[in-house]
Amino acid sequence: MKKVKKILILAVLMLFSNNTMGANNATIYDHSLIDIDGNSIDLSIFKGKPLLLVNTASRCGFTPQYEGLQKLFTEYRKTDLTIIATTSNSFNQEYSSTEEIKKICLANYGVGFITSSPISVKGEDAHPIYKWINKEYSKKPKWNFYKFLFDRDGLLVDSWSSMTKPSSKKITNKIDKLI
């Protein structure tokens, strides 16, 4: 009887640990986005590369950070670093038209990194990427230009608020360790 009990307990523990492990194996690379031109981007194409994800808006006091992101993109262009800006009106500071957003990104800041079409980054309407970040890491953008850095395995390394500029040593030192 004791042997049967032990086997049952062991079986339940194994079942529980398998379910838990499966739930935590997700990475940033298990997601996809629609870019500013309407093309689907499967983030799995960036597997093995560090990725900086930034929620952005065109009518925000932090919008000039596009310039800093572009400088970062240019500086790290020959490395594996991928930069993705997810445009969002979650804080009521983004245009509704992708054409207007493109004009700001391209004409004003010469953005060359990947930019998504507008998505939600908070609440029930949040894009699955941001729901995943919140669920797995208890992190979510509190404002525009929150930055999330993922390692080559697609796991979150660090995140920074809008107040941290893209050129900050806090960010570049972490990137340098990943590339």
Residue ranges and their predicted role:
Residues 1-6:
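Positively charged n-region of N-terminal signal peptides that target proteins for export
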Residues 7-16:
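Sec-dependent N-terminal signal peptides
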Residues 49-50, 59, 64-87, 106-109:
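Conserved helix-turn-beta segment immediately C-terminal to the redox Cys motif
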Residues 99-144:
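Short, internal strand/loop/helix patches
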